[in-house]
């Protein structure tokens, strides 16, 4: 059976030079960077039967097991080496998440991934700055017109022309492949950080707020890779709970 994500993009890539799909990973984490993945699928990509076979199990990265994601990641890299597609990742640091907030940092990571995929493709696709109305220029020639799609709603702070597709990683092959690149790239980074900071169990939770991660934050405090913006509510709640416990202990001492 043909992957419905393949069919979705194959149909909509008509009358265009191809599709660029972009997604992110790590937006809701307590630690580590936010990473974006960009996949450029030239229109000829959909004319090669071997490519369809290679993409048969591509899906939203969140719907895949870790070993499935890693195998598909390797397949995407291999397709890139064969010049069937172009891929890139970009990231925004914890410091940038703090200064730009998570939305701004996500846009920054996406922008970097898009710029890098343009470089890797030797300018086959070039970023187009948004027009005043933010819409695609329908007068462009087919050879120049690329469908640029990001997962979710359009990003106001992303400066390049694009469209947003709600739950796009469940519809679009290019976006789903971008989500795999972003997720595996980020997971690899968090596993490396886990060797340096074993208390937080980054290799398992990848920076999300698992019970073990939260217990380590309570006992060890945050490290340099934690996001201050994301920890404030947690730390404030912990301090409030501690004050309540202390008050209760004080009251009990008078009984």
Q: Model segments located where?
A:
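RNase H-like, Mg2+-dependent phosphodiesterase core
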Residues: 1-255
